[in-house]
């Protein structure tokens, strides 16, 4: 039997961060947990909250690190080891400043573009070669600091679109699992 895929939604714990741009990974992970009919529970050995089940015919471990974003690898590394998941079988769902608001992009490996959550995961896995579901939050307006921007709630104009965007990111994750990177990219990257 194949080892499970590890699907990690990045975010910050606690209600103060729940509706921020940086937490779209958590929102998508919650949607995926609903799709597999599983709730999150604490995983003692890793410190993350996990839900297990099947997505697109594959065994998956969904995870939400309980550390702050910049230390996500502290939970992801031990989880990957515990479940014997190779880095290439890790899918990280995260916010992306370099993609326009509402766009979803799939990627394998490459740089971390200043995203400290990705940097922490890459350090814990010992490689940047893992799969990513990138949820576009766009660049901050004017001269606003990017670190401040991602920790702010979505604007009143953006907020009504967020549930649909997160559902699309969950759909993209399922396509990635079902079809592999290139076929899923061809479909997802064509979405308006």
Curated annotation (Swiss-Prot):
It catalyses: an N-acyl-L-alpha-aminoacyl-tRNA + H2O = an N-acyl-L-amino acid + a tRNA + H(+). Its EC number is 3.1.1.29. It is an enzyme of class 3 (hydrolase). GO terms for biological process: protein quality control for misfolded or incompletely synthesized proteins; rescue of stalled ribosome. SUPFAM superfamilies: Peptidyl-tRNA hydrolase-like. Keywords: Cytoplasm, Hydrolase, RNA-binding, tRNA-binding. One of its GO terms (molecular function) is peptidyl-tRNA hydrolase activity. The record marks 95 as: Stabilizes the basic form of H active site to accept a proton. Pfam families: Pept_tRNA_hydro. The record marks 12 as: Discriminates between blocked and unblocked aminoacyl-tRNA. The active site is at 22 (proton acceptor). Its main location: cytoplasm. It is found in: Cytoplasm. GO terms for cellular component: cytoplasm. TRNA binds at residues 17, 68, 70, 116. Hydrolyzes ribosome-free peptidyl-tRNAs (with 1 or more amino acids incorporated), which drop off the ribosome during protein synthesis, or as a result of ribosome stalling. Monomer. Belongs to the PTH family. This is Peptidyl-tRNA hydrolase.
